[in-house]
């Protein structure tokens, strides 16, 4: 399989060697190369597309999980934890290895022939190839609706070639500025490209005013109805279970209809917002009464309680509390600091040197009694002991006298979370989540 998956990246890596690393997506990415095949594979499908800066994966899983109670539902998400085929699912079941290999071989054969006609600085995106494979698989499985998650952006993301019935926009903030834009307005305009004329609706999570203004303007221009949380549907009840950090919510629609109580399967207040957004989307798609009836079924609530999304504030231990989250920027870390403001954690940060590790450490200071920076062995990401030296300089670290250190052996920190008597928080990129899964697998061999 590795030899086949190397073909996914061949065109991309060829072009990357001849491109300016600091250039934005609009100068490097070429979604028009995969658009014809994606549009052909997506023909006759009902598709829901999801973008934003935080919570794309969670809300994609929630929407798909609800829809698959009635519809055969395809799900395309990124990134994966251990296997690439985790990104492609039908009714939450991962694509079979034999089918994945067949689609990978056929699809890369087509695109590598196309690559031979391209200049050396122009490449085909691995995401475009995977999206083509996913849509072909969904067609083979005769899905009746698909949920597809964008990558970093929208305007130059290959997924944007997928015809969509509904768009979903999670909170947008400053992130991936090198690729998407230097200002929040540039990033919002990039992601607002999810809104296209002919769509039935677009749903938006809570946004800062500058972002919401851009989304409203785009929706008005494209003549697409925009449904906003807290305006067109809203949480009317929200209570936290202190032991688990999970929330029970109730959601009301604009016409006065209201769901019963639903316990969100993942901890964190933002997951309550994510699930409320999923309720808004699926209420529109299925019909409010049909959704409300489903949410009241105890059998559905039992199934929902077993839904897990690795790396999304994953609870590794309850006593003491040990949490792991794919958090690589300060904005995401602020959510955690607010959510657990009454606790103190030993915080492990595994964020590459070219990402916002300083922002993560600054935001998490209020709930940290110690910070340890570490690294993964993934060759595509750069980590350095110098990161700890930068964190030591932070005012919040100095004022609170928070010990900061660097530990190059991540496995030793995974082992520590098994034996620690103090709350622990592991924050980092998905390569950390993957490293944990691999460590856990070795431990149980």
Descriptions of predicted regions:
Residues 431-432:
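Alpha-helix capping/helix-boundary segments
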Residues 1-52, 59-69, 76, 115-119:
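Short functional linear segments
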Residues 76-79, 204-206, 218-241, 264-269, ...:
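Beta-strand->loop->alpha-helix junctions that form or flank phosphate-binding loops
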Residues 36-43, 71-162, 178-180:
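ATP-dependent carboxylate-amine ligase catalytic core
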Residues 145, 157-168, 172-176, 186, ...:
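Nucleotide phosphate-binding/pyrophosphate-handling subdomain across enzymes
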Residues 114-118, 141-142, 149, 164-261, ...:
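Acidic, Mg2+-coordinating active-site environments of NTP-dependent enzymes
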Residues 208-227, 321-324, 361-423:
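C-terminal helical cap/extension that packs against the catalytic core
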Residues 63, 153-165, 437-440:
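Short Gly/Thr/Asp-enriched flexible loops that form oxyanion-binding sites at enzyme active sites
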């Amino acid at each position: 399989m590795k030899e086949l998956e190397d073909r996914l990246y061949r065109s991309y890596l060829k072009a990357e060697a001849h491109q300016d690393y600091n250039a934005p997506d609009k100068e490097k990415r070429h979604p028009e190369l995969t658009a014809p095949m994606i549009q052909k594979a997506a023909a006759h499908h009902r598709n829901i597309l999801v973008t934003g800066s935080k919570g794309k994966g969670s809300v994609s899983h929630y929407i798909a999980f609800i829809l698959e109670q009635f519809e055969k539902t395809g799900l395309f998400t990124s990134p994966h934890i251990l296997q690439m085929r985790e990104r492609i699912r039908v009714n939450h079941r991962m694509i079979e290895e034999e089918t994945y290999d067949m689609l990978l071989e056929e699809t890369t054969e087509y695109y590598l022939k196309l690559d031979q006609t391209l200049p050396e600085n122009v490449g085909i995106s691995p995401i475009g190839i995977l999206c083509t494979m996913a849509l072909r698989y969904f067609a083979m499985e005769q899905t009746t609706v698909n949920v597809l998650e964008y990558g970093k952006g929208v305007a130059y993301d290959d997924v944007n070639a997928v015809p969509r019935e509904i768009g979903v926009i999670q909170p947008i903030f400053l992130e991936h500025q090198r690729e998407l834009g230097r200002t929040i307005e540039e990033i919002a305009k990039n992601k607002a490209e999810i809104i296209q004329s002919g769509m039935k609706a677009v749903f938006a999570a809570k946004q800062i005013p500058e972002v919401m203004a851009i989304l409203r303007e785009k929706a008005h221009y494209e003549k697409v109805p925009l449904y906003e949380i807290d305006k067109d549907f809203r949480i009317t009840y929200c209570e936290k279970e202190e032991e688990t950090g999970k929330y029970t919510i109730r959601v009301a629609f604009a016409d006065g209809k209201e769901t019963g109580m639903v316990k969100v399967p993942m901890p964190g207040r933002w997951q309550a917002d994510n699930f409320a957004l999923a309720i808004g989307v699926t209420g529109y798609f299925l019909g409010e009464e049909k959704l409300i009836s489903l949410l009241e079924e105890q059998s559905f609530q039992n199934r929902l309680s077993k839904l897990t999304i690795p790396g999304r504030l994953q609870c590794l231990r309850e006593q003491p509390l040990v949490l792991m989250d794919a958090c690589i920027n300060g904005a995401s870390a602020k959510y955690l600091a607010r959510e657990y403001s009454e606790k103190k954690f030993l915080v492990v940060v595994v964020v590459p040197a070219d990402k916002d590790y300083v922002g993560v450490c600054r935001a998490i200071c209020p709930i940290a009694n110690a910070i340890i920076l570490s690294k993964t062995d993934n060759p595509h990401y750069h980590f350095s002991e110098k990161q700890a030296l930068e964190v030591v300089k932070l005012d919040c670290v100095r004022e609170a006298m928070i010990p900061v250190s660097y530990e190059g052996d991540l496995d030793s920190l995974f082992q520590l979370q098994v034996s620690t008597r103090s709350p622990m928080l592991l924050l980092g990129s998905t390569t950390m989540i993957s490293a944990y899964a691999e460590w856990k697998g070795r431990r149980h061999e």
